[in-house]
Structures are given as structure tokens and as C-alpha cells.
Amino acid sequence: MPLNRRDFVLSSAAFAGTAALPGLFGGSIARAQQPLRILFLGGTGFLGPHTVQYAIDRGHDVTLFNRGRTNNDMFPELEKIVGNRDPEVDQGLSGLEGREWDAVIDTSGYVPRIVGASANLLSDRVGQYLFVSTICQYNDWLEGDKFRTEDWPRGTLEDPTTEDVSTHYCYLKAYCEIAAEAAMPDRVTQIRPGLIVGPRDNTDRFTYWPMRAERGGEMIAPGRPTDLTQYIDVRDLAMFMVHCVEQKLTDDFNVVRQAMPWGEFLDACISAADSDASLTWIPGDFLSEHGLEPWQQLQMWSDADHPMSGSLTWSSARAINAGLRIRPVEETIRDTVAWYQSLPADRQAEMRSGIAADKEAEVLAAWHEHQA
């Protein structure tokens, strides 16, 4: 079943403006042997800036194309072409006409007509089109067998011409993939990320858990320690995307870390916090009876036998074999917490995901009464 974008959007558009993203990749970054001319369609949201920064650090010549409305102060040293992804709005794509690049990285495509317009316009003047899709473009992506591969069929819509992204975000991405492939056969890289997390993720879906561990005390641990969870650090995703362009890899890739035990993830959150947080494991059916549901209040978790468990157990073997590198969960937790704690106090006080403190206390009390 398709999931509404309002319920689950895998890449956040919320982003705090900055002129650069120094130091987020750690250590010195080797320069690419052959610098490329790379055009970014978008590049100023959440994933885009991380990818732009890594491409710059690798020595590539980067151009940004967007409307010039979001985080316009970012990357002042780069060439910026102002336009609109929709060729029917304002100056449309006219700023791209007559130009050539080695590769395009499209982080802002949501409607097949619009993705097709850019891919067709650039088909004779770029060598490779890398499109950022989503893991939820697959048919019945929430359900089904665990560790499904890129061979799983795409989702379909009764009306593939719809442009209602808020309702059909997931399966519209599947049609965007098809549009890009039709314009540039055998020259498209389809990147299908799972939940994108890390520094500058303003959704708080990942961040809630380590920050809750920081608070200490008794903490709800939904389900069982053996349930599985899965995500991708935005920096690992960015590095793999640039790697695909540098190596001219044209394939479909699920880009997620290998599924890990849920208990291991929560233990890592507590260890990183060095707090007195203690886990109280509560079955999913009890939590549901008390208004706590997977991917609503309980982000990143689903019971192993829940209809949504397939969302957290995709295979990333193809991407790993192609060069995807996954940093330790402890590093993602540490850096995300450090970023979050650098935000203004009023923002930190308004966690955007997770269980409200009073609700957690209420459910814990009900659980202990039930156990008694």
C-alpha cells in the first residue's frame, strides 16, 4: 500500500541555512583523479548540501540550478543558475540551454513530467544522470519479504499523470525513474535511500532516540531487542552518490546501512549519552492500545510481524559491493547529537518526532500496572 508523504517522507527538505558544511566528512578528503563538471538540480535542502560539499572537497566543478529561494546564502563561491524545474513556470529550464556537464545530480525531482523535462533537455549534453529516488518507490514497500533487492517491482498508480506529491510521493518517484531512463537509456543512476539521518536532519526521527537517552531515566523501548532497524547517514549517502558519478556507475541502488538489531541501536544511544537511561521493553500491541504507533510516535521501529516491518529491512548488498561505505552507528549518533545541541534552545525544546515526555510517563505507568 502506498504511504502518504505526510506520514513518511524519506528525505527531509527542512534545513538550516549555512555558507558551507566544513568538517562533516571527517579528516582530509583526497582529490579526485579527474575533476568533473557536475550540475546539481536542487542542492540546498538536506541531502543536497552534503553532496555538494563533498563534490567540492573532491575537487569537482559544481554548478547549482534552483529557484534561488532556499538557503540562498550557501556556497557563494559556486556558479548558480536561477530557474524553475517546471518548464512551464517562469523562465523554466532556459538557463541550462547550450551548456554541457559531465554529470547531473538530481536531488529535487518529485514529478515525472518535470524530471523528464530536465533529462530530455540535457540528454545530449551530459554523460550521466543520477536521480535520487527513494526506497518507498517499490510496490508494497512496507510489507513483504525481508532483505528485498533492487529487482523488486516498482509501485504503480491508477493515474500516473497525477502530480499530487503530498499523496503519492513514493510511487511518483517510481515514475520519475522511468522518465529519466526514457530520456537517457543506460546512462541513469537510480539512488534509492532509506531513512536519511545525521547532522542537519530537522525531522528528528533519528535524533529523538539519542536525545531521549541523554535525558536519562526509564525509557520506553518498543517491541523486542531482536526487531530490526535501518537508515542511511546523509554523509555516507552523499559520498556514494559522488562515487557513482566518478566511477560512471549506472545501475539501481538501494542505499541503506545493513539492518541492525533494534536493541543494539538503543544500547548505542545510551552508551553515547553516558546517561542513566534504562530500557523498559513493551510489546507493540500494548503500545498501539495506548496510542503509540510505528512511524508515528515510534520512529525507526516496527514489530517484526507488523505489516510495516518491510520498510526497515531492505538489502543494500549491491551498493556495498559497488563502494558504499557505512560509518559506525556510534559516529552517526555522536555527530547528530552534537549538531542538535548546537541549535537554539527553543528549537531543542520542541522535538519534532518521538514520544512526548508526559505521554511516555503515562504509558510506562500503565505498563507497570498491567504487569502487576
Walk through the language-model features, giving the residues of each.
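Conserved Rossmann-fold cofactor-binding substructure of NAD(P)-dependent oxidoreductases
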Residues: V82-E100
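Mid/C-terminal beta-alpha module of Rossmann-like enzyme folds, strongest
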Residues: H243-A317, R334-V337, P344-Q371
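Short-chain dehydrogenase/reductase
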Residues: K146-E177, Q230-Y231
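N-terminal secretory signal peptides and thylakoid transit peptides that target proteins
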Residues: M1-A19
